[in-house]
Amino acid sequence: MTTLADLRINYSRASLDEADVAPDPFAQFDRWFKEALAAKLPEPNTMTLATVGENGRPSARIVLIKGVDERGFVFFTNYESRKGRDLAAHPYAALLFYWIELERQVRIEGRIEKTSTDESDRYFASRPLGSRIGAWASEQSAVIDSRATLEAREKAVAERYGENPPRPPQWGGYRVVPDAIEFWQGRPSRLHDRLLYTRDAAAAPDWTISRLSP
């Protein structure tokens, strides 16, 4: 019988060398993300978001990246959810993209800022109607007594707003403004390639690339 200790694979698809990466981590992320899309990976925009609450306890969950540019990495959520409360208490976060089919990870750390009202409005308006209604119906992370309660709220919101629900005031975007981005490429014998981009401040233009021991 296979045990947990027996489960392992040997990584051998590719390598990651300093001479081959972009000097800017956003350009390198764009390169890898396009390769994930070309490989037709299921939902390559999924990432783990790690936060820390007011009590010092960490928590993590899967969310979807919805924007990347030189300012940072953007996702949207309910500001009153657990992650929203965590980020209000400690405005720093870590992100992790894991593309196992390509034997790659991207790890991102940085401070958090809310996106502008206009940016949140534009993205909310682009969502499917059901998702916009759901943003009103769900008091994310709050305890509810039954599924029926949630569905009743959904029906009430749909009847109230019809085809044009506005963005709820408690719903919007966050941007992770990174000061560290690590690119990880699996290699044989667990001697993986790890290249870390860092900068002294989140707004600094220049990045330093360091190789980390696996």
Curated annotation (Swiss-Prot):
NCBIfam families: pdxH, PRK05679.1
Residues the entry annotates as binding substrate: R8, I9, N10, Y11, K66, Y123, R127, S131, R190, L191, H192
Catalytic activity field: pyridoxamine 5'-phosphate + O2 + H2O = pyridoxal 5'-phosphate + H2O2 + NH4(+); pyridoxine 5'-phosphate + O2 = pyridoxal 5'-phosphate + H2O2
Name of encoding gene: pdxH
Quaternary structure note: Homodimer.
Protein family (similarity comment): Belongs to the pyridoxamine 5'-phosphate oxidase family.
Keyword Flavoprotein (UniProt): yes
Cofactor(s) annotated in UniProt: FMN
Repressor recorded as keyword: no
PROSITE patterns: PYRIDOX_OXIDASE
Positions that bind FMN: 61-66, 76-77, 82-83, 105, 140-141, 184, 194
Cofactor comment: Binds 1 FMN per subunit.
Metabolic or biological pathway, per its Swiss-Prot or TrEMBL entry: Cofactor metabolism; pyridoxal 5'-phosphate salvage; pyridoxal 5'-phosphate from pyridoxamine 5'-phosphate: step 1/1; Cofactor metabolism; pyridoxal 5'-phosphate salvage; pyridoxal 5'-phosphate from pyridoxine 5'-phosphate: step 1/1
Ranges in a coiled coil: none
Function field: Catalyzes the oxidation of either pyridoxine 5'-phosphate (PNP) or pyridoxamine 5'-phosphate (PMP) into pyridoxal 5'-phosphate (PLP).
InterPro entries xrefs: Pyridox_Oxase (IPR000659), Pyridox_Oxase_CS (IPR019740), Pyridox_Oxase_N (IPR011576), Pyridoxamine_oxidase_dimer_C (IPR019576), Split_barrel_FMN-bd (IPR012349)
Domain of life: Bacteria
Group of enzyme by EC: oxidoreductase
E.C. code: 1.4.3.5
Protein name: Pyridoxine/pyridoxamine 5'-phosphate oxidase
Keywords of this entry: Flavoprotein, FMN, Oxidoreductase, Pyridoxine biosynthesis
Molecular-function GO term, any one: FMN binding
GO biological process: pyridoxine biosynthetic process
